[in-house]
């Protein structure tokens, strides 16, 4: 399976998105956990194609994180891939043409008035685009996984069986939103109350 997604045997420290994380839990075997995951896919009735698509997204995110972008040359702001091999791996995993991906990444076509032109991008802009792509792929892939699990659980079609996911960052934003709803009327009415007290 590692060969299929061009992951190699380097381990978790070989991937920029995971190498700085606390990736070891005492008493937990990653190999055993992966076997359990694959067994759970089987039990839930995930087809081989569904399993492949889930794992493909994870592999793609890892490969995106390892694409390094640098200025084309000294004094130039135009970006280039430091090692095109990593982009080749990503494109292979996703089944997309390398040339189109690289052009779209480094010099995307944008509309300028009535014409289309290729816009040069800086290394920072390209890195931002890569991170956004990884985040978008992961978010959609995870959302699709939850949807697939819910479809497998909801055998009666009544929506009684499902899993829900709490997005902590989103929940914190929701908490701030609720605080603002409560605070806004108070902030609006407080000056009136103070004037009445005087």
Model-derived features: where do they sit?
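N-terminal switch/interaction subdomains of large nucleotide-dependent motors and GTPases
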Residues: 1-198
């Amino acid at each position: 399976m590692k060969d299929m997604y061009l992951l190699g045997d380097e381990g978790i420290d070989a991937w920029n998105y995971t190498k700085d994380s606390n990736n070891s839990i005492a008493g937990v075997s990653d190999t055993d956990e992966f076997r359990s995951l694959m067994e759970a896919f089987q039990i839930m009735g995930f087809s081989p194609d569904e399993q492949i698509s889930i794992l493909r997204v994870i592999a793609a995110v890892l490969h995106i994180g390892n694409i390094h972008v640098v200025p084309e040359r000294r004094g130039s702001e135009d970006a280039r891939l430091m090692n095109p091999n990593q982009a080749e791996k990503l494109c292979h995993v996703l089944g997309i043409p390398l040339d189109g991906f690289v052009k779209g990444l480094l010099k995307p076509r944008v509309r300028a008035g009535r014409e289309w032109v290729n816009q040069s991008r800086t290394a920072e802009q390209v890195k931002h685009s890569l991170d956004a792509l990884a985040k978008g792929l992961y978010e959609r892939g995870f959302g699709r996984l939850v949807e697939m699990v819910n479809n497998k659980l909801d055998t009666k079609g009544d929506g009684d069986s499902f899993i829900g996911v709490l997005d902590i960052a989103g929940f914190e934003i929701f908490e701030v939103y609720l605080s603002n709803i409560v605070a806004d009327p108070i902030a609006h009415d407080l000056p009136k109350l103070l004037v009445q007290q005087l």
